[in-house]
């Protein structure tokens, strides 16, 4: 939704106590700007921000590029501060984007729990999220940003691949 969910005084505790315990952090551009304490306007800025975030103790950082303009959206995976790969996706014209960040990180976690490597887990999670966004793009639920359709293909959630 774009709303800040953490109070300012909690940020230091998050950075010093929780972030070093994480295997993967999945900030969007505004969140990465806060964590890296720098403005992000291009790919070079993303690289510098990811290096700064990794220095805080997190091995993997997936900076999500959904806030950049354009028809194609690119997410960047860094391992130990170095660009490992990028993931390209399309922009979907919808107001139903509430929870996309949480859905992506939860899907990645579920694929990691199924013993997939980080790259495969992220790729599979992005495929799942894209399907959920497309399946829910025209739903009308409540006011403002609506949710993605998490149950667009339930069989895929329960079968081992």
Q: Which functions belong to the PLM regions below?
A:
Residues 4-84:
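Conserved phosphate/ATP/ADP-binding segment of small-molecule kinases
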Residues 31, 66-69, 90-93, 126-129:
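Glycine-rich beta-alpha junction loops
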Residues 34, 94-118:
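Short, small-residue alpha-helix embedded
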Residues 67, 98, 150:
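Histidine-centered active-site/metal-ligand motif
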Residues 83-98:
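Short pre-catalytic strand/loop immediately N-terminal to key active-site residues, enriched for Gly-Thr
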Residues 83-85, 111-125:
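Phosphate-handling active-site elements
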Residues 119-161:
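Charged C-terminal helix
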């Amino acid at each position: 939704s774009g709303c800040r969910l953490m109070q300012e005084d909690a940020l230091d505790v998050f950075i010093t106590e929780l972030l070093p315990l994480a295997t993967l952090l999945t900030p969007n551009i505004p969140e990465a700007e806060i964590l890296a304490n720098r403005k992000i306007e291009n790919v070079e800025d993303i690289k510098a921000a990811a290096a700064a975030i990794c220095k805080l103790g997190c091995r993997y950082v997936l900076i999500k590029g959904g806030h950049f303009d354009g028809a194609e959206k690119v997410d960047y995976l860094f391992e130990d501060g170095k660009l490992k790969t990028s993931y390209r996706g399309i922009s979907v014209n919808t107001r139903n984007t509430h929870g996309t960040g949480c859905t992506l990180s939860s899907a990645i976690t579920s694929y990691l729990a199924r013993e997939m490597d980080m790259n495969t887990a992220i790729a599979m999670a992005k495929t799942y999220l894209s399907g959920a966004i497309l399946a829910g793009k025209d739903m009308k639920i409540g006011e403002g940003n609506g949710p993605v359709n998490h149950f667009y293909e339930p069989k895929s959630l329960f079968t081992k691949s």
